[in-house]
Amino acid sequence: MSAFEVYRRKFKPALPRAIQGASYHLHTEEKTHPVADEQDIAALFPKTTHLPLLDIQPDTGAPKLLEPKRVGVIFSGGQAPGGHNVLCGLYDKLQQIAPKSVLLGFQNGPKGLMTNKYVELTEKFLEPFRNMGGFHAIGSGRDKIAKPEDFDAAAKTAKDNNLDIICIIGGDDSNTNACLLAEDFLKRGLKTAVIGVPKTIDRDLYSTKGIECSFGFDSSTKVYAELIGNICYDCLSAKKYWHFIRLMGRSASHITLECGLQTHANICLVGEEILSKKMTSRQLFEYLADCVTKRADSGKNYGVCLVPEGLIEFIPENNELFAYLNNTLLPHWTGELTADAVAAKLPDPLRTTFMAIPASIRTQLLLDRDPHGNIAISQIETEKFLGAGVQQVLRERGSKTKFTPLYHFFGYEGRCAAPSDFDCSLCYSLGAVAAILGCNGKTGYMASLRNLVRPPADWSPIGLPLTCLMNMEMRHGHKTPVIMKQMTDLNGNPYKLLARNRDTWLMNDDYQNPGPIQQIATESAEGTAVCARPTITLIEEARK
């Protein structure tokens, strides 16, 4: 264990004032409704739809200790900084409100739950993982509880281990699984409560009803922003490269937007804006070429451009092209597969779209296929797609502008980072909220916290019904209940802050280097230290 890890284990995560002790009460608030498709959701989830929101408030009465509980917990999906503190917060709160409770960590995600593979999480077991990054205490996985036999297996595990609670720590798909499992257990008459915890660095698991920020977003964006800040200063020092930096976020641009606000990169592309303007690939290349040319005209043949990894899928014409290739043309293809041969077989509008894609990327599209033979959109290097597009436009214009692109992808660097103070306390508090909800027999709820721009003592713990996040979407040709992903709000304050400063940041070298995550308080006043500051996104969203 490194000197840093030894030091970091000593940090004491903060809890909201309402749940610092063992005296609290659950206040029932308004009945909730699904975010869309209410009739369909209510028909599929008759036992958990329209549950009330629960506000956990402090109680001045004597602590009411509960009987020991048997609790299972899993990580589901990709890693995010702070996950281990959810386990620690869950364990510590269980021992406080239901002494001698047993916590079982099912290994490697939902598969561990279905196969009954677990390790008991004790004080001694958890000690090395407090305030540490990663999910390696019990591992994670992307298996889904989807088939009837999967639900049977999960129910068998719950019964065999006499579980009172199962806590699922994951993103939108994982919490959709939690919602399905809660409903299934109620239909079976099982006593096991199912509680979800919101995890995703992408921050597409968000709700105005009570999810202000999923854990991991704070730490990961601060890691990426540090790296981007370093590149900005390198860019300013060398004055000869354009850096195209792809950032995680296939479905939403929250990470890219936050990093742009932290670093003042010259260009920060927001996929949702491109979608709203119905931009074509060619229009995007033209815009970027204009930006490069404007800076070059000012003697600046360098810059930094931030790109969400899912950008290509925000361009409407690309989705039409990919759908036609995957569903109509490629399944019946015979003979040599070349870009020219494919172009000759495409109808006119789609041929134009295909030929607007740089030649090197066209070849990659056809060669990189998933196991089903479809174009592997997630494998497209978006930053190179844009850089090649700019080169193509400049070449067609006969421009003498000097343009030397360099490419970066920041993704896995941030998923298992040592969590920030914010994420340490957020995760620890989420674990505690999950324990309270489950120990009080609540099922089909997500543990959450409000007022996150305040110091942790002022955070408001709540239980949010999972069904109020649900809608129906087409998956594999069928309408399926899922938690709705939340995209970047183009009417929201964070985006407006970018829009107001976009032209200035493009032309000026107004770079900011936020530096590494600060983990030592430098001011005495609570909440004023650099290490205590939340993201700019949260601060801006809290502004009225």
UniProtKB/Swiss-Prot annotation:
Protein location: Cytoplasm
GO molecular function: 6-phosphofructokinase activity; ATP binding; diphosphate-fructose-6-phosphate 1-phosphotransferase activity; metal ion binding
Pathway of action: Carbohydrate degradation; glycolysis; D-glyceraldehyde 3-phosphate and glycerone phosphate from D-glucose: step 3/4
Any one GO CC term of the record: cytoplasm
Residues involved in Mg(2+) binding: 172
Regulation: Non-allosteric. Competitively inhibited by fructose 2,6-bisphosphate.
EC number: 2.7.1.90
Alphabetically ordered keywords of this record: Cytoplasm, Glycolysis, Kinase, Magnesium, Metal-binding, Transferase
Biological-process GO terms, alphabetical: fructose 6-phosphate metabolic process
Annotated catalysed reactions: beta-D-fructose 6-phosphate + diphosphate = beta-D-fructose 1,6-bisphosphate + phosphate + H(+)
Recorded effect of pH on activity: Optimum pH is 7.2 for the forward reaction and 7.0 for the reverse reaction.
Coiled-coil regions listed in the entry: none
Binding-site positions, substrate: 200-202, 240-241, 248-250, 309, 412-415
Primary location class: cytoplasm
Xref: HAMAP family: Phosphofructokinase_II_Long (MF_01980)
Function of the protein: Catalyzes the phosphorylation of D-fructose 6-phosphate, the first committing step of glycolysis. Uses inorganic phosphate (PPi) as phosphoryl donor instead of ATP like common ATP-dependent phosphofructokinases (ATP-PFKs), which renders the reaction reversible, and can thus function both in glycolysis and gluconeogenesis. Consistently, PPi-PFK can replace the enzymes of both the forward (ATP-PFK) and reverse (fructose-bisphosphatase (FBPase)) reactions.
Name of this chain's protein: Pyrophosphate--fructose 6-phosphate 1-phosphotransferase
Taxonomic lineage: Eukaryota, Metamonada, Diplomonadida, Hexamitidae, Giardiinae
